[in-house]
């Protein structure tokens, strides 16, 4: 049983039957059948739906997809019904819609009447020219008549003569064209509210030669009076006639000149004599038969005034000449013709509307370029301007007004030899072009043979990659629509001569490949030499284009359809492809083989449309791919309207940049100065400006020096390196490399980031010229390479910047400008189709991330990923330059560190990868490392933290062997040798872990091998890591000599922890600068490594301190304080609590510091006083030799303490000790040594083993942790009060100091910033000292303080107990003696036993009451064990006990 019929199936029109621009009634749910016309979804950025028709509704201007069953054709009957219905109450806008569609329908009907003449022409054409197949197609198109009638008076009916014979080649092309058109989104329906698409038939048919009878005098046949000679040069293809086919005169000259009257000189290649709109596609195709490949030249001598014979003669002559020229393109034409045939069927089905294509060499080329080109939009848009009569003109006017939105003057296009103007059949452009042609009234004789009338058909722009609305929107192409009325009138008189540049290799090239294919990205191919052309109106072609351009912009749909100029220079392969409509960059002269200076950026029509609508979104304007390697000289111009050069008078119009790139600067300037067409020099710039502003803002064609390295001599070189296909990616890299090299030269002198060459841009000229495109490369090729298309750039760049900008004086402003230019310019490089576009996007993204970078792993990771992506596009050098420039201009040091961390992350990530990222970033950064370090870690005290972080990163690189060791070591040494660490105040020390910001990537890195950024996190044993990796960090904060013990790995091997006393020599401290043994010396509270071979002994010798002897056994002299060290505080600390009665009076004068030699094992220097040797404290050898302060380099300043300078050298420290009236006794035993903590030097947290005393004579141990191994605290030396290093010189009494520790406390607090609040008298001793007990002669208890790993960070918050008589089992964790006030819960050591400290020990808690004046100064405390006591301030009484809060 047969299936039931679909409801409405009988009314439904098959999609294949519907043509673009057909008038229909579309039923939408909730509304009556609404007047609409078939449109192209691509014009509206809509994806085509194969099962539905895309319609544009009249009245509301809305669009939608409607199923075929819901669509019925709009006919006379339907019109009557709707009119009657409108008499009553109707839905809002319905009446208006009916009126609009009725008007469109009437126009189409008029066109049908005109098309009759075209049928006659088609019939006149030899059958070989037209094939019945096409006739059939035309008949199928017959349905489209209503469409054409509605959409285009000329086109709509052009094809009505279905029976007319159509040139088989043309027919095929037409069909293919129609298919393509259907496919192409640019079909006229896109127009809002314009019921009539401009000749849609032409678009659909893509018939180059199809002419609308509308333009005919109105009789429809008058134009035919002129004989149209069609010479069909067929390559030996079966499809095409091999012999030239001369079309017999077609009584209907109108048909021949449907689009525009063809003067005797005019040749319609693709046009078929019988271009019958009635025949529609068939005829149109027939007309197109001439399609470029076939090189059929149909000379429609339509000028009514001229006799057909005369016209024929003239045309013959011209044609023969042209044929000779175009002979070379014959083969290509064949191919093109073949393609169109296959496509025609599809096209006819999909697009009934026919495209009128003006005859011209351009068409032939188009067809040559694979009939597809002609089919799509290559077809020269029918020059509607060639209207046969007044009626035609009136019709054109109407159509024009309706279609005002977009049209490129075909005349202007045609004026370009070999240039193809594509115009949607439904676009008024065709009409306009024809009309403009008539207006131009340039006799065939006037036009050079090369020149040919071109109509731009953009209907297929979407299909064609090359077409880009933005490109189309460029100011270069004037819209013919403005001229349409004029041209319509003149069209009768004027014949448009479409010459085939047969000889031009360009045409051949394009002919071989469909222009669409050639210009996937650029819809326009400008003839290389358009300069000489004048529009029919007598105006420079470009001027016309400029006018048209603006409207195009207004109607983005059509903009991409603007003119696609294929500028063909005979004999030259150069073709400048203009992506935008009508972007002839340089109309200057054949000399400029590529209009635009050769760069034409192509974008797929869809992209173009989008760009027009949202130019900012079109960073893709540049279709990099389409730098057509195929065309040796094709320069891609971005849709953004890369400045084109017009030889025209107006410099404004000229976009010198592109030409300039190709040509010498002077030439460029000249070209710029010239207006594109010599018409309204200002108008073009305005258009360009608009385009630039809209498009270029986001899609500036910023041809940074790096982006474009244009060889001036090679005008043909692609203007944009990024407009390149993969094949040209290497080229782009070369260009970028060259630009960067130049940039580097400019920047070699500390100039920030990428300063384009001084000559790179002449912004002033741009501004003065007012041409948005006027980017003038001042003097250098790099400058040429740099083009800024957008006015925005011009605005951004001030003339001062023009002066450019390398000068350091203008550096900041210049940098900003450059940055702006750089980022925006890269944006301009956008082309979704091209890697260059993606590269530009990635670069811009990276630049944005730099601006918002924070020191968080996530932020750095994101930016790193983008940087790696940039490397994939070959712009790693730009990324590095961006970083350098940002580092150089960044005023805040922490931000510099963030950026350097980002660089580190990029380097580590690229190092871990194989391939391009690694190959690009590593060498690039290596070469730029001096600049990077100079910018990230500048000299000066304020950048100390930066240098520290940079050294850390460099050591990491060294460890991972990312860069050569010698190089990294040199830089590390340079950073370490800056010496400012010694002079920088303690306040600049690196914050402790607890103080770091929560987002600090280094905060939680104890367990990581270092990938702070989370990308390469390798975990190690925390102890090992801490010692190797982070202790280093802390140490760096400590002042260090150039030999700073910041060995890259901080490998301090404390192998002999078991031994209470180890030779310092056993500690292996690998200094970055040298491996010489170092002596750890307490310098104002900071442990410093000093070269002291004498001190490197297996046995730790007691240091004999002599009261008045400044000499030290270490043979170190007491240098004066470093110039940068802060002076000792002059103000006395708050009055200390009263001393215990037994405490000696403050010394009258400070004892001279007697530096203690490295104590030999248990070797006690003879006490100056009878102090019991027990009081000497064994100094752990490790502390003596520890390479540098481990992770405690920085202790927060205690209130009351002057900010300590970074630890000074031992000499300096000793001096300070002298000044503080203290001396250090270095011994293996810990003895109470009062030190005035106020001497800020010791405050450095790095002093792990020193006792920091508050400013009172008493002191608190800063860190009792032996640096190397735990050492028993054995009194190796008596504390000599006067002779001892640290204790106040009491009156020469030989009494043993009576130490009454009241709650001595050892706080295990590495990195404690605050000095122990305990009264300075508090002297936590591991030794048993009873408050009431006089000092013990010795402290037999060996307190083995576990060697402190280089990094004690992990122990920061931990409190370690020291067993009374043993070494700490864990060598990794040294017992740290807290510097802070003992807090509740903290352990205090009393009598060698840890005890919970009092909540806050009173000021006298641990005060050692000096029983005798000669209280033996505490023996020196080993570096980690607080062996070196901070000196008490001289002005503070020795007994004074000051406990800072």
Curated annotation (Swiss-Prot):
**Where is the region Disordered?**
133-197, 211-302, 319-356, 409-439, 460-491, 641-685, 797-835, 1110-1203
Q: List the GO cellular component terms.
A: nucleus; plasmodesma
| Organism superkingdom | Eukaryota
Main location class: nucleus
Query: Does the keyword Hydrolase feature in the UniProt annotation?
Result: no
**What are the alphabetically sorted keywords of the record?**
Developmental protein, Flowering, mRNA processing, Nucleus, Transcription, Transcription regulation
**Which InterPro entries does the annotation name?**
CID_dom, ENTH_VHS, PWWP_dom
Q: Where in the cell is it found?
A: Nucleus
For this protein, the parts annotated as crossing the membrane are none
The family database entries (CDD domains) matched by this protein are listed as:
PWWP_HULK (cd20147)
**Where in the numbering of this chain does the CID domain appear?**
838-979
Q: Does the keyword Nucleus apply?
A: yes
Q: Pro residues composition bias: which ranges?
A: 1124-1170
Q: What does the UniProt entry report for the null mutant?
A: No visible phenotype under normal growth conditions, but the triple mutant plants hulk1, hulk2 and hulk3 show delayed flowering.
The protein depicted here goes by the name Protein HUA2-LIKE 1
**What's the encoding gene here?**
HULK1
């Amino acid at each position: 049983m047969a299936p039931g019929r679909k409801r409405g199936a009988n009314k439904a029109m098959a999609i294949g039957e519907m043509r673009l621009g057909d008038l229909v009634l579309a039923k939408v749910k909730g509304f009556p059948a609404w007047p609409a016309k078939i449109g192209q979804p691509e014009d509206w950025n809509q994806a085509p739906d194969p099962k539905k028709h895309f319609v544009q509704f009249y009245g509301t201007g809305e669009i939608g997809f409607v199923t075929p069953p819901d669509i019925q054709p709009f006919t006379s009957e339907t019109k009557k019904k709707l009119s009657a219905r409108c008499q009553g109450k109707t839905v809002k806008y319905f009446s208006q819609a009916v009126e609009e569609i009725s008007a469109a329908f009437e126009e189409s009907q008029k066109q049908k009447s005109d098309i009759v003449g075209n049928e006659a022409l088609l019939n006149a054409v030899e059958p070989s020219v037209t094939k019945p197949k096409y006739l059939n197609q035309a008949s199928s198109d017959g349905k489209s008549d209503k469409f054409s009638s509605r959409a285009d008076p000329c086109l709509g009916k052009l094809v009505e003569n279905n029976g007319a014979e159509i040139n088989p080649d043309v027919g095929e092309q037409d069909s293919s064209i129609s298919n393509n058109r259907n496919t192409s989104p640019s079909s006229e329906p896109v127009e809002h509210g314009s019921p009539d698409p401009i000749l849609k038939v032409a678009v659909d048919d893509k018939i180059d030669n199809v002419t609308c009878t509308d333009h005919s005098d109105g009789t429809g046949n008058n134009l035919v009076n002129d004989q149209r000679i069609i010479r069909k040069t067929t390559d030996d293809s079966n499809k095409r006639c091999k012999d030239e086919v001369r079309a017999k005169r077609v009584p209907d000259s109108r048909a021949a000149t449907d689009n525009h009257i063809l003067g005797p000189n005019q040749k319609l290649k693709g046009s078929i004599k019988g271009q019958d709109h009635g025949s529609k596609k068939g005829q149109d195709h027939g007309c197109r038969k001439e399609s470029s490949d076939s090189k059929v030249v149909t000379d429609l001598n339509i000028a009514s005034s001229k006799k057909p014979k005369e016209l024929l003669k003239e045309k013959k002559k011209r044609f023969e000449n042209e044929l000779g020229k175009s002979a070379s393109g014959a083969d290509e034409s064949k191919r093109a013709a073949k393609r169109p045939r296959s496509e025609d069927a599809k096209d006819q089905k999909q697009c009934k509307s026919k495209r009128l294509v003006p005859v011209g060499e351009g068409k032939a080329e188009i067809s040559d370029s694979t009939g597809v080109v002609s089919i799509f939009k290559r077809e020269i848009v029918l020059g509607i301007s060639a209207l046969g009569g007044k009626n035609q003109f009136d019709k054109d006017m109407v159509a024009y007004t309706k279609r005002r939105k977009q049209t490129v003057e075909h005349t202007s296009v045609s004026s370009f030899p070999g240039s193809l103007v594509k115009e949607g059949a439904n676009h008024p452009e065709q009409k306009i072009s024809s009309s403009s042609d008539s207006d131009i009234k340039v006799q065939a004789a006037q036009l050079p043979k090369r020149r040919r009338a071109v109509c731009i058909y953009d209907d297929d722009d979407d299909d064609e990659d090359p077409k880009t609305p933005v490109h189309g929107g460029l100011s270069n192409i004037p819209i013919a629509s403005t001229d349409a009325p004029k041209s319509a009138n003149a069209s009768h008189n004027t014949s448009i001569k479409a010459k085939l540049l047969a000889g031009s290799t360009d045409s051949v090239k394009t002919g071989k490949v469909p222009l669409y294919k050639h210009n996937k990205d650029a819809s326009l191919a400008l003839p290389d030499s358009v300069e000489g052309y004048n529009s029919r109106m007598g105006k420079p072609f470009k001027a016309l284009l400029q006018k048209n351009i603006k409207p195009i912009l207004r109607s983005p749909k059509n903009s991409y359809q603007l003119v696609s100029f294929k500028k063909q220079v005979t004999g030259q392969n150069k073709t400048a492809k203009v992506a935008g409509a009508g972007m002839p960059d340089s109309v200057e002269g054949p000399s400029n083989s590529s209009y635009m200076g050769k760069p034409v950026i192509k974008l797929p029509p869809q992209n173009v449309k989008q760009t027009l609508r949202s130019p900012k979104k079109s960073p893709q304007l540049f279709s990099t791919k389409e730098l057509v390697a195929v065309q040796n000289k094709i320069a891609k111009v971005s849709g953004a309207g890369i400045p084109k050069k017009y030889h025209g008078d107006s410099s404004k119009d000229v976009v010198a940049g592109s030409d300039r790139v190709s040509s010498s600067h002077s030439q460029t300037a000249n070209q710029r100065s010239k207006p594109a067409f010599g018409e309204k020099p200002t108008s073009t710039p305005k258009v360009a400006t608009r385009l630039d502003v809209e498009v270029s803002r986001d899609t500036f064609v910023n041809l940074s020096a790096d982006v474009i390295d244009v060889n001036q001599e090679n005008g043909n070189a692609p203007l944009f390196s990024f407009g390149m296909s993969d094949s040209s990616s290497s080229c782009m890299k070369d260009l970028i490399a060259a630009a960067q090299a130049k940039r580097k030269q400019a920047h070699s002198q500390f100039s920030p980031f990428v300063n384009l060459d001084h000559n790179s841009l002449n912004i002033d000229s741009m501004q003065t010229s007012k041409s948005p495109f006027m980017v003038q490369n001042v003097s250098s090729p790099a400058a040429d390479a740099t083009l800024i298309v957008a006015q925005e750039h011009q605005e951004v760049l001030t003339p001062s910047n023009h002066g450019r900008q390398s000068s350091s004086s203008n550096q900041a402003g210049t940098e900003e400008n450059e940055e702006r230019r750089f980022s925006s310019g890269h944006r301009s490089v956008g082309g979704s189709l091209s890697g260059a576009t993606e590269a530009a996007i990635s670069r811009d993204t990276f630049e944005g991330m730099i601006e918002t970078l924070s020191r968080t792993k996530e932020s750095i990771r994101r930016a790193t990923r983008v940087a790696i992506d940039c490397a994939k596009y070959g712009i790693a050098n730009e990324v590095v330059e961006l970083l350098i420039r940002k580092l150089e201009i960044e005023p805040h040091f922490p931000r510099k560190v963030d950026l350097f961390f980002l660089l580190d992350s990029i380097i580590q990530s690229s190092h871990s990868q194989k391939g391009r990222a690694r190959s690009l970033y590593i060498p690039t950064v290596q070469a730029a490392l001096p600049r990077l370090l100079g910018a990230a870690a500048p000299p000066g005290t304020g950048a100390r933290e930066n240098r520290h972080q940079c050294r850390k990163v460099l050591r990491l690189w060294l460890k991972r062997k990312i860069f050569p060791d010698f190089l990294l070591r040199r830089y590390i040494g340079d950073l370490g040798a800056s010496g400012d660490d010694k002079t920088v105040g303690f306040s600049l020390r690196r914050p402790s872990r607890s103080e770091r910001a929560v987002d600090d990537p280094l905060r939680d890195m104890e367990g990581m091998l270092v990938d702070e950024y989370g990308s390469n996190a390798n975990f190690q044993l925390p102890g090992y890591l801490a010692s190797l990796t982070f202790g280093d960090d802390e140490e760096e904060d400590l002042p260090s000599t150039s030999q700073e013990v910041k060995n890259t790995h901080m490998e301090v091997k404390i192998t002999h922890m078991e031994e209470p006393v180890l030779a310092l020599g056993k500690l292996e401290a690998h200094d970055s600068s040298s491996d010489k043994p170092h002596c750890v010396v307490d310098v104002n509270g900071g442990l410093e490594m000093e070269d002291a071979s004498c001190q490197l002994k297996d046995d730790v010798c007691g240091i004999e301190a002599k009261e008045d002897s400044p000499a030290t056994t270490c043979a170190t002299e007491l240098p004066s304080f470093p110039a940068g060290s802060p002076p000792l505080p002059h103000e006395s600390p708050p009055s200390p609590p009263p001393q215990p009665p037994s405490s000696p009076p403050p010394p009258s004068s400070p004892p001279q510091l007697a530096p203690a030699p490295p104590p030999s094992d248990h070797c006690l220097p003879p006490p100056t006083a009878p102090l019991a040797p027990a009081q000497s404290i064994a100094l752990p050898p490790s502390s003596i030799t520890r390479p540098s302060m481990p992770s405690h380099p920085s202790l927060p300043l205690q209130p009351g303490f002057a900010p300590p300078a970074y630890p000074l050298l031992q000499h300096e420290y000793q001096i300070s000790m002298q000044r503080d009236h203290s001396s250090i006794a270095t011994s293996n035993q810990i003895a109470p040594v009062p030190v005035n903590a106020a001497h800020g030097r010791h405050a450095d947290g790095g002093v792990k083993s020193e006792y920091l005393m508050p400013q009172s004579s008493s002191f608190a141990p800063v860190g009792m942790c032996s640096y190397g191994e735990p050492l028993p605290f054995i009194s190796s030396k008596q504390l000599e009060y006067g002779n001892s290093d640290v204790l106040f010189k009491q009156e020469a009494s030989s009494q043993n100091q009576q130490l009454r520790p009241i709650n001595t406390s050892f706080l295990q607090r590495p990195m404690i910033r605050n000095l122990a609040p305990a009264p300075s008298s508090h002297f936590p001793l591991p030794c048993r000292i009873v408050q009431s007990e006089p000092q013990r002669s010795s402290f037999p208890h060996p307190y083995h303080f576990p060697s402190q790993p280089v990094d004690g960070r992990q122990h920061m918050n931990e409190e370690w107990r020291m067993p009374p008589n043993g070494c700490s089992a864990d060598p990794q964790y040294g017992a740290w003696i807290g510097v802070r006030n003992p807090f509740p819960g903290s352990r205090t050591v009393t009598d060698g036993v840890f005890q919970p400290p009092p909540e806050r020990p009173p000021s006298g808690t641990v005060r050692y009451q000096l029983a005798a004046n000669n209280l033996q100064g505490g023996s020196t405390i080993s570096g980690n064990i607080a062996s070196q006591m901070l000196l008490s301030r001289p002005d503070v009484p020795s007994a004074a006990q000051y406990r800072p809060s």
